[in-house]
Design a protein with these regions (language model features):
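Secretory targeting signals
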Residues: 1-5
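Acidic, metal/ion-coordinating pockets
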Residues: 7-18, 22-318
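Hard-cation-handling environments
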Residues: 323-325
Length: 325
């Protein structure tokens, strides 16, 4: 049973995180039914796992004019749009069932539609897209902690973040608000996703937005959770999904605490990283913003082992993608 196995998994993760009880927001989280979780593989057959990432879409429901610099000239093209992204995702899944889709934050702030509905209008849209995993960004707190929990709790897929805690007052730290990690078990390999959002949220934005939440630096528990994923969960590949901004993500990838991490799929600063930035311990990428791009990390798997990884920044060109109905 899909639900039973998933609840067992998040229960184990909660024990690791020191979470004594599961809230409804966690129990309601289920991976997309469209995602292939087939753990079997044929001997000597080559499989490709495609991990697709969006970030910082900021409620841009429709295609918009995106600026490109080409041949020393400014060029504008219509890109993005959730209906176009839905078409892209469906084509990707049809082409390769071993596709896993994530969004790394800032999905409920940035448009009049979101403001007038306190973000609620975006929930059915995101659920229709069939994401497999979410990370809260710095703007998920725009309507306050309770609304953040309600909005993210209404999304079908799991949410992870290892550095957002309930603030019990007087500097006392409570439990993690979200699970710290999620594992995709497919084709004989286990991919661990560990989430971190920007701990500077109470400084860079009004502290009233994030009242009731304590943030910690990623490096505080990163090594611990990498060890949990590698040693306890026996993950073959560890990905940090982050909403820290490119400079913080590069900084993190060069810290000893990041040893054992393969990739940081980042967000926040809207950077178009076309070639992975190789740091001391991990590669760092970021797929732009506003739904104009999708980051595609492809992992090659043979006999239950990951033999190669490649990355591409894909433009969501509206003219090439018919709007999904």
């Amino acid at each position: 049973n899909n639900r039973r196995s998933f609840l067992k998994k998040i229960g184990a993760a909660g024990t690791v995180a020191g979470v004594s009880s599961l809230t409804p927001i966690l129990v309601s989280a289920l991976p997309s039914e469209m995602t292939n979780n087939n753990t079997t593989f044929e001997k000597d057959k080559t499989y490709t796992l495609d991990i697709l990432q969006t970030t910082d879409v900021h409620c841009q429901v429709h295609p918009h004019d995106e600026l490109f610099w080409e041949n020393d000239k400014a060029v504008f093209r219509r890109t993005g749009g959730y209906p176009q992204m839905a078409t892209y995702f469906k084509k990707a899944r049809k082409s390769n069932p071993d596709t896993f889709i994530i969004d790394t934050g800032d999905m409920f702030q940035g448009s009049e539609l979101s403001v007038k509905t306190t973000g609620k209008a975006l929930v059915p849209v995101l659920n229709q897209l069939g994401y497999d995993l979410y990370l809260p960004g710095n703007w998920e707190v725009i309507y306050g902690k309770r609304n953040m929990q309600t909005l993210l709790g209404a999304l079908d897929a799991p949410k992870v973040c290892a550095n957002m805690y309930h603030d019990l007052g007087d500097g006392k730290r409570g439990e993690l608000i979200f699970l710290p990690y999620y594992i995709w078990n497919v084709r004989g390999v286990k991919i661990g996703f560990l989430g971190y959002t920007d701990p500077l949220v109470p400084i860079r934005q009004s502290p009233n937005y994030s009242k009731g939440i304590l943030y910690t630096p990623a490096e505080e528990n990163l090594a611990h959770y990498v060890s949990v994923l590698k040693e306890d969960e026996r993950c073959d590949y560890v990905i940090v999904i982050a909403h820290l901004g490119l400079s913080q993500q590069i900084y993190l990838a060069n810290l000893p605490q990041c040893e054992g991490v393969d990739y940081i799929l980042g967000g926040d600063t809207h950077e178009r990283v076309r070639e992975p930035i190789q740091c001391k311990y991990a590669k760092v990428v970021e797929p732009g913003a506003f739904g104009s791009f999708v980051g595609s990390l492809k992992l090659t798997v043979v006999n239950g082992k990951i033999t190669n990884d490649t990355y591409e920044l894909v433009e969501v060109r509206a003219a090439d993608l018919k709007a999904d109905k």
